[in-house]
């Protein structure tokens, strides 16, 4: 039996022990045994200690160090619940952070009480730019600060009573963790995507196929005649991880390259708000595009919010169309093919100009020596020559993000001074560059059809280009016509429908060798390198020729070295011509190594980039299943047990994965997409049994609160704002200033954070849990109001009073067996059924409402002593929401074991059936009265009751209805 925090061992009266005599002022006159913040603090502290000592939430694995020591089998009925793990910032938690954590804890506790083996753990996503920036500002090493932050987060989370298996917690910065991040990187690096098999395969199998002659080189060369270096180049070009000279988002102010998702819509860094420039650099890339179809198609088997699925579908962006080859002439006189991709090949006859992305590889080759005679000044951008105009335009758009370029309403561009031949008409069309065409989508070149594409129409109008109608039905003098119609001005396509024309022109392009049917995606390969310090080092070294070599798995982990200067080389934020200089380049002893990679001891240099902050979160769910495994990232048996497909439970298409994943929708096209990609590669290579990482996803809403800004729009600390005379003032350093109230997401940026420590101190953790769960559906954002927290506290006080006499501490429960009245039994079993259904569906707010209703019923119905048979089920039902209070009451009721493993009460179906039914009575469609009849009353009895109702009779005023309609169990309608 565990010792109660509020009872002296051996005492039967429940007299408090260790509770200070001076309680807070608000409750100084309260009865000695009332459920107060101080009593709650003692209860919570002791039960948290008990849970930790007893390992209450520790769950067994089938194999390994967490398997049952006696060799017993693990339960078949299991559940894996996971939260998006937090970044341990220096500010600690605010009350918005625990919303999802509490919700999943309620869900996990409920299912644990139902007898399921529940895995619920929480780690920390601790690598990344924020810790590095803080370290640079303060001179504190990122690891020192991060570890201190993790300790504080664990303390704050521990106060909430979350039922996590603490043995499974880790940080992505733990060497034992990122060793396996590096290992997974090597698995992806040493793999290639077999398009015919639609899966990844080991790179060794590709080499074997080339060696045997089973596979030929696409360029026609003979594999057997290639040098070792040439063979390595071929293999490197097939890898799922590769280096490429690609356009990247270079941020001089941060000294690093950013992924597209880390750049805001106005072309600035998400962190720091620095300008970001498009720049060509050699970078590590991950070939996520190889999985475009599978990432898209497998969304159909996931139980995810439609919003997130739509965001991923749009981000992947599958488009069906055709490629077409326009021929042009280089500046040296050579003919070159300009390939475009279009979803509207039917409009090819209407293509009156071409547009290339300013970064397109062929732009410099196609720039004319001078402007053709009679060139329109609108085309030249004010440049004396095409080369000058192109250079100036590139400089002007370098600061724009991809999103800003696509959404810009003002269409700009410059003429290259050269033309290409339209394969449909045989006529020359001018070639432009413009920022609304992106190098990363399609071929980086488009055929412009201003008559039937609004962006092209806007561009043509701005630069005075011709507009040709090829689909009848609109007025192209006013706007582009994008509807259906019959083809016109299109040669052999005239008279065809749009669908017929698409097929016909695609077939003609294929037969003439000028194009083919094609599918394109918006998704780009993943830029997988950062010029920072605080991240996972790459398990890659370079030889004297600069060729990369993967380290053997036995060389892992490649540990991040401690260096005296870990700050990146920062540049003038506006210096677009600066070049990255990673901090790890300063660690010379670590950088230069001698290794034997199979051909003798040779000098190598390590890669000085680090992995992006998304690396650890792309696989961390797997490590929860086997956190101490030193030989594998996780044992296959453990992954299969926790994450394997369960078709009997979820249907034949069940992809497997975590049973419930809860986190913010802001990660839809970042973490969630990257995690799916890594998981699919591991699945293809046979390392996991599940083909998706997360079977079910729920996005929790935000907790919002008032924030305040001064006249400049800068936020001021909300807790220091004073409301006065209908307005708000802030006591600044130079006196009071007027501030303006707004409503937004709670957090440090708006300076309106409220610490959960503050609420726990004032009310107790169980009160915070109940309040946050009662605020609304988990998916909805909700306003925080500290003044409303007291309502949750008073509810728990009422539950406490049903069991404990506030004056004496004695148990009030009636143990004498007595026959319960029907109303009490009906209230009990309806509460059980409703609360259980709500917990299972994560409707915690309505579960709270039902528990309050049942508590109020017991308070009114049983004023002296509540029968044990109806109070114990209440304690069990409250346990997922307020576990500390429930454990304490459960023990005081005489139980010697924790209720964490149940059993959760079961409802008796006999008491869920109504004896009576209330019918609204309508007269000509409007409700005029209500009648209550027996649940088994037939239509005649219902009609009679409706006609006999005094309110209905008064409204009828003696008139007889022409028709009486009874909708069984729902309503009666009298037609007069």
Swiss-Prot record:
GO terms for biological process: leucyl-tRNA aminoacylation. GO terms for molecular function: aminoacyl-tRNA deacylase activity; ATP binding; leucine-tRNA ligase activity. The keyword Nucleotide-binding applies. A motif ('HIGH' region) lies at residues 86-97. InterPro entries: aa-tRNA-synth_I_CS (IPR001412), Leu-tRNA-ligase (IPR002302), Leu_tRNA-synth_edit (IPR025709), M/V/L/I-tRNA-synth_anticd-bd (IPR013155), Methionyl/Leucyl_tRNA_Synth (IPR015413), Rossmann-like_a/b/a_fold (IPR014729), tRNAsynth_Ia_anticodon-bd (IPR009080), Val/Leu/Ile-tRNA-synth_edit (IPR009008). One of its GO terms (cellular component) is cytosol. It comes from the Bacteria. Its EC number is 6.1.1.4. PROSITE patterns: AA_TRNA_LIGASE_I. The keyword ATP-binding applies. Its main location: cytoplasm. It is an enzyme of class 6 (ligase). This is Leucine--tRNA ligase. The lineage of its organism: Bacteria, Bacillati, Actinomycetota, Actinomycetes, Mycobacteriales.
């Amino acid at each position: 039996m565990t010792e109660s925090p509020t009872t002296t061992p051996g005492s039967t009266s429940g007299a408090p022990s260790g509770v200070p005599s001076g309680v807070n002022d608000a409750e100084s006159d309260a009865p000695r045994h009332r459920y107060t913040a101080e009593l709650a603090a003692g209860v919570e502290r002791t039960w948290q200690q008990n849970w930790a000592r007893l390992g209450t939430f520790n769950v067994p694995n089938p194999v390994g160090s967490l398997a049952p020591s006696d060799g017993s089998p693990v339960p078949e009925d299991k559940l894996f619940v996971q939260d998006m793990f937090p970044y341990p910032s220096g500010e600690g938690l605010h009350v918005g952070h625990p919303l999802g954590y509490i919700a999943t804890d309620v869900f996990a506790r409920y299912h644990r009480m139902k007898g399921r083996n529940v895995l619920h753990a929480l780690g920390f996503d601790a690598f990344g730019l924020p810790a590095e920036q803080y370290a640079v500002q303060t001179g504190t090493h990122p690891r020192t600060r991060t570890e201190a932050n993790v300790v504080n987060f664990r303390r704050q989370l521990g106060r909430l009573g979350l039922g996590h298996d603490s043995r499974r917690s880790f940080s992505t910065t733990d060497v034992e963790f990122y060793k396996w991040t590096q290992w997974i990187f090597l698995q992806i690096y040493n793999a290639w995507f077999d398009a015919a098999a639609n899966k990844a395969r080991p790179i060794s199998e590709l080499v074997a196929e080339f060696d045997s002659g089973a596979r030929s080189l696409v360029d026609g060369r003979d594999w057997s005649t290639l040098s070792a270096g040439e063979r390595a180049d071929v293999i490197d070009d097939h890898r799922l991880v590769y280096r490429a000279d690609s356009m990247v988002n270079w941020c001089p102010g941060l000294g690093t390259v950013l992924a597209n998702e880390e750049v805001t819509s106005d072309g600035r860094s998400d962190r720091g708000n620095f300008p970001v420039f498009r720049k060509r650099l050699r970078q590590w890339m991950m070939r996520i595009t190889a999985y475009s179809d599978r990432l898209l198609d497998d969304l159909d088997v996931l139980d995810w919010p439609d919003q997130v699925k739509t965001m991923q579908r749009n981000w992947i962006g599958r488009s069906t169309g055709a490629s077409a080859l326009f021929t042009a002439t280089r500046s040296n006189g050579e003919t070159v093919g300009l390939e475009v991709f279009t979803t509207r090949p039917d409009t090819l006859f209407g293509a009156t100009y071409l547009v290339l992305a300013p970064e397109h590889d062929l732009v410099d080759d196609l720039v004319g020596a001078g402007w053709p005679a009679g060139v329109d000044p609108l085309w030249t951008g004010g440049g004396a020559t095409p080369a000058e105009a192109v250079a100036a335009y590139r400089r002007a758009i370098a600061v724009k993000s991809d999103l800003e370029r696509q959404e810009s309403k003002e269409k700009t561009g410059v003429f290259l001074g050269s033309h290409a031949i339209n394969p449909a008409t045989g006529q020359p069309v001018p070639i432009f560059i413009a920022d609304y065409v992106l190098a990363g989508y399609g071929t980086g070149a488009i055929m412009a059809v201003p008559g039937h594409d609004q962006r092209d129409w806007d561009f043509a109008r701005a630069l005075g280009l011709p507009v040709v109608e090829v689909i009848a039905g609109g007025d192209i003098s006013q706007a582009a016509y994008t509807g259906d119609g019959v083809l016109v001005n299109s040669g052999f396509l005239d008279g065809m429908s749009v669908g017929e024309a698409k097929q016909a022109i695609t077939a003609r392009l294929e037969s003439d060798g000028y194009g083919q049917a094609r599918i394109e995606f918006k998704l780009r390969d993943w830029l997988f390198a950062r010029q920072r310090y605080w991240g996972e080092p790459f398990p890659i070294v370079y030889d004297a020729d600069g060729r990369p070599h993967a380290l053997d798995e036995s060389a892992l982990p490649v540990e991040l070295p401690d260096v005296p200067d870990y700050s990146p080389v920062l540049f003038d934020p506006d210096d677009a011509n600066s070049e990255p200089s990673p901090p790890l380049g300063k660690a010379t002893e670590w950088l230069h190594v001698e290794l034997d990679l199979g051909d003798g001891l040779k000098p190598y240099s390590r890669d000085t980039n680090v992995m992006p902050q998304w690396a650890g979160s792309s696989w961390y769910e797997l490590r929860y299943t086997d956190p101490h495994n030193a030989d594998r990232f996780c044992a296959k048996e453990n992954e299969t047990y926790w994450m394997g497909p369960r078709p009997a439970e979820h249907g034949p298409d069940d992809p497997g994965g975590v049973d419930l994943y809860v986190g913010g929708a802001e990660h839809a096209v970042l973490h969630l997409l990257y995690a799916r990609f890594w998981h699919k590669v591991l699945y293809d290579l046979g390392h996991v049994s599940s083909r998706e990482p997360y079977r079910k996803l729920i996005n929790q809403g935000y907790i919002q609160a008032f924030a305040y800004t001064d006249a400049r729009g800068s936020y001021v600390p909300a807790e220091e704002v004073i409301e006065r005379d209908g307005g708000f003032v802030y006591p600044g350093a130079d006196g009071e200033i007027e501030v303006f109230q707004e409503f937004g997401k709670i957090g440090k940026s708006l300076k309106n954070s409220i610490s959960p420590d503050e609420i726990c101190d004032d009310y107790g953790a169980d009160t915070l849990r109940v309040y946050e769960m009662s605020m609304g559906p988990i998916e909805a954002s909700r306003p925080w109001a500290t003044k409303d927290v007291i309502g949750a506290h008073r509810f728990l006080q009422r539950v406490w009073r049903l069991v404990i006499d506030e004056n004496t501490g004695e148990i009030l429960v009636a143990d004498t067996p007595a026959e319960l009245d029907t109303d009490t039994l009906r209230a009990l079993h309806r509460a059980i059924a409703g609360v259980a259904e709500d917990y299972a569906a994560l409707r915690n707010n309505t579960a709270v409402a039902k528990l309050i209703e049942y508590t109020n019923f017991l308070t009114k119905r049983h004023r002296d002593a509540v029968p044990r048979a109806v109070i114990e089920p209440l304690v069990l039902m409250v346990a997922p929401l307020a576990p500390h209070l429930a454990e304490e009451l459960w023990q005081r009721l005489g139980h010697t074991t924790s209720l964490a493993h149940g059993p959760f009460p079961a409802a008796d179906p006999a008491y869920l059936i109504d004896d009576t039914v209330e019918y609204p009575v309508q007269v000509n469609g409007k409700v005029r009265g209500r009648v209550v009849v027996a649940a088994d009353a037939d239509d005649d009895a219902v009609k009679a009751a409706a006609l006999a109702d005094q309110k209905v009779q008064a409204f009828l005023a003696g008139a007889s209805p022409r028709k009486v309609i009874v909708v069984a169990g729902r309503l009666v309608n009298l037609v007069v």
